Amino acid sequence: MRQQDAPKPTPAACRCSGLARRVLTIAFALLILGLMTWAYAAGVPLASDRYGLLAFGLYGAFLSAHLVAQSLFAYLEHRRVAAAARGPLDAATARSVALTISAYQEDPAYLRQCLASARALLYPRARLRVLMVVDGNRAEDLYMVDMFREVFADEDPATYVWDGNYHQPWEPAAAGAVGAGAYREVEAEDPGRLAVEALVRTRRCVCVAQRWGGKREVMYTAFKALGDSVDYVQVCDSDTRLDPMALLELVRVLDEDPRVGAVGGDVRILNPLDSWVSFLSSLRYWVAFNVERACQSYFHCVSCISGPLGLYRNNLLQQFLEAWYNQKFLGTHCTFGDDRHLTNRMLSMGYATKYTSRSRCYSETPSSFLRWLSQQTRWSKSYFREWLYNALWWHRHHAWMTYEAVVSGLFPFFVAATVLRLFYAGRPWALLWVLLCVQGVALAKAAFAAWLRGCLRMVLLSLYAPLYMCGLLPAKFLALVTMNQSGWGTSGRRKLAANYVPLLPLALWALLLLGGLVRSVAHEARADWSGPSRAAEAYHLAAGAGAYVGYWVAMLTLYWVGVRRLCRRRTGGYRVQV
């Protein structure tokens, strides 16, 4: 029998196959959940000294194996990307692409860099469109329209200030009419929408300022106005500086494999030397993309195509555009987590999502702790919400997607439980031992990142662990209980508003830990330290405290000598006046 004559599976067979995959996926997820919970709760020791002070348990072994596997697959993905052939792009057959930029109260310096980098993209001009949509049409928002017109002055740019948006109710009578009396004629459709679509589909460089509606409304306008006029759609934020090769490398990934529906690039920090927060964020970003997402890309299931740099197949995007925009959670319309839900919609269709380190951009990150905390809280909200949606489609992708989702979803809860248990029921050495293990694992992960990147400064990533434990961890629990509250969060940079709500869980967390610490110290002060086991514990406590202090002295010295000096000089960084 010839291959083309092979019988196709019947719909019933497809349904049975899909059901079987669902059952197996659920069983696998429950297995991972059960094993992790049992390993954590049972506390099975694998190795220990005679007094049980230096112990290594099954749960620790599981997490260590997870980090090793993740690092290995990330390395293999980088090897695969580096070995891939990269021939020149044929301008005659290049896919048509629309670069969409979402803008909201952007700092003028960042916006100018973004637009200039869009002009400098190495992609056939005839196959590339640039569309910026501004969230706001008031007088104070129009400086972004003027800047777009200025930067693209030689490209015959088109600009339009729209009184409404796609979801603003339009009244024909309010739009004006022709004639009088019984022969009065009114517009049948919103003339603003028609004008926007006509400009977007006929001009190469277009900027639209529309009625405020949030970032998702802005992105919807760009996607809807484009329709099916292009092959691929690139998303970008207005604080992002694109590498000249960024778009070309993304296009190559989609061109190489029709099963890939979306691809993301390497997002780096534009202002790493503004503060210690932005510096640690720059290191964390690199690991998040080049280790964690590179690992996911090895299995074709990247969980989030980041907003500053992503490319989607337009024919697929248009299929779920309305469902994406109208997403609701607990009865509330979702206005954040746009990028993660776009990725989830693509995954729900069974298409792969990829990451390539060859495509790169630079994006602004908060330099103040409070604004960083607000950003992380907002991102955590979308993570938990999208985790639930993502679970519906685990069966359509590699088992790694299920495994990693379960592990990463449970991790914050296990960390919080461990910390509280040690502070309230543990002895001083047990608490110090866990802190040493946490920093040891963080240092090992940072050392691998330093080797993979070829940059010794990456070892300072281990300083991010306390920031996670003391700041990000309580923020995640605030996000969990406020998932249905929405807003732009940290996206507007021209006018920064302080939001002190994320400090509340930090204060509660600090009080909980302080209470546990006081209780443990009071209990240990009454204990008898004369026995051999207590003497050994005192010795380990002194040695461990010395090692812990020595570690911090070394890391902080490296930071102050190698980084903080550069922060003062702002070498290689970007200082933006707000």
From Swiss-Prot:
Known cofactor(s): Mg(2+)
Single GO cellular component term: plasma membrane
Organism domain of life: Eukaryota
SUPFAM superfamilies: Nucleotide-diphospho-sugar transferases (SSF53448)
EC number of this enzyme: 2.4.1.212
Swiss-Prot/TrEMBL catalytic activity: [hyaluronan](n) + UDP-N-acetyl-alpha-D-glucosamine = N-acetyl-beta-D-glucosaminyl-(1->4)-[hyaluronan](n) + UDP + H(+); N-acetyl-beta-D-glucosaminyl-(1->4)-[hyaluronan](n) + UDP-alpha-D-glucuronate = [hyaluronan](n+1) + UDP + H(+)
Gene: HAS1
Cytoplasmic side stretches: 1-25, 74-399, 452-457, 519-540
Biological process, per Gene Ontology: cell adhesion; cellular response to platelet-derived growth factor stimulus; extracellular matrix assembly; glycosaminoglycan biosynthetic process; hyaluronan biosynthetic process; negative regulation of fibroblast migration; polysaccharide biosynthetic process
Pfam family, one: Glyco_tranf_2_3
Locations listed in the record: Membrane
UniProt cross-references to InterPro entries, sorted A to Z: Nucleotide-diphossugar_trans
Primary localisation category: membrane
Membrane topology type: Multi-pass membrane protein
GO MF, any single term: identical protein binding
Major enzyme class: transferase
Protein name: Hyaluronan synthase 1
Function, as annotated: Catalyzes the addition of GlcNAc or GlcUA monosaccharides to the nascent hyaluronan polymer. Therefore, it is essential to hyaluronan synthesis a major component of most extracellular matrices that has a structural role in tissues architectures and regulates cell adhesion, migration and differentiation. This is one of the isozymes catalyzing that reaction. Also able to catalyze the synthesis of chito-oligosaccharide depending on the substrate.
Pathway(s): Glycan biosynthesis; hyaluronan biosynthesis
